[in-house]
């Protein structure tokens, strides 16, 4: 999307006014997917194009962007070059676990944005083809997000069909709580992980869409204290 937008910028002044009109541009997708196979996808845009967009487009539209989709490679350029005062929806696409975790722990710009502005968040963690994913990392990332995002309403956490990223809370010592989250989409390892989410931790949850990797006998019991839960899909 953004590469097409850039191709129309600076054609004429009148055309710029039309293309960059705040009535039309509210969502900005800073990815460009190249699909080698169903499981092998690249989301990065060309470096030269990225630089031009950050220099020529973002300063002109940053104040009107409500929704932003950004991948790991362009994160530094897009998030750190300019602020987005109207941004409330953020999608972080194709991130490595460790890099995403570092952003959540150490990057003050990202932490401030999540804490003060974001109400809708999508997280896509890329598959590790050289080693098994560290599922405890995912549970830590999940807990950090709930802790940081004070006004989070909707969260899509690693719920993408072409990914194998699965979250588990079996080994986690983190305490996942949110008093604002109403919609959660997530992939988990076992039914026990599902039970973990259905207690007082997410007391405002009304919609839970969950993929459970392993459906097996469990000693746990469903103690659903999420009084507002009206939709449960697995």
Feature-to-residue mapping (PLM):
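Eukaryote-biased activation of long, low-complexity terminal tails and linkers
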Residues: 1-234
């Amino acid at each position: 999307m953004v590469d097409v937008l850039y191709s129309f910028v600076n054609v004429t002044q009148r055309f710029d006014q039309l293309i960059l009109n705040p009535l039309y541009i509210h969502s900005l997708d800073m990815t460009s997917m190249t699909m080698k196979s169903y499981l092998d996808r690249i989301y990065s845009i060309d470096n030269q194009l990225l630089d031009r967009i950050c220099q020529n487009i973002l300063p002109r539209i940053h104040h009107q962007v409500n929704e932003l989709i950004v991948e790991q490679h362009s994160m530094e350029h897009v998030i750190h070059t300019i602020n987005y005062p109207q941004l409330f929806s953020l999608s972080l696409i194709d991130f490595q676990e460790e890099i995403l975790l570092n952003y959540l722990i150490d990057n003050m710009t990202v932490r401030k944005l999540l804490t003060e502005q974001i109400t809708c968040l999508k997280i896509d963690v890329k598959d590790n083809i050289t080693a098994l994913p560290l599922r405890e990392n995912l549970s830590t990332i999940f807990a950090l997000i709930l802790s940081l995002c004070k006004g989070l309403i909707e969260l899509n956490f690693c719920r993408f069909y072409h990914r194998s990223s699965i979250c588990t809370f079996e080994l986690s010592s983190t305490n996942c709580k949110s008093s604002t989250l109403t919609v959660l989409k997530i992939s988990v390892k076992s039914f026990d992980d599902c039970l973990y989410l259905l207690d007082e931790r997410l007391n405002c949850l009304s919609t839970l869409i969950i993929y459970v990797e392993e459906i097996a006998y469990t000693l746990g019991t469903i103690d659903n204290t999420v009084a507002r839960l009206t939709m449960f899909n697995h």
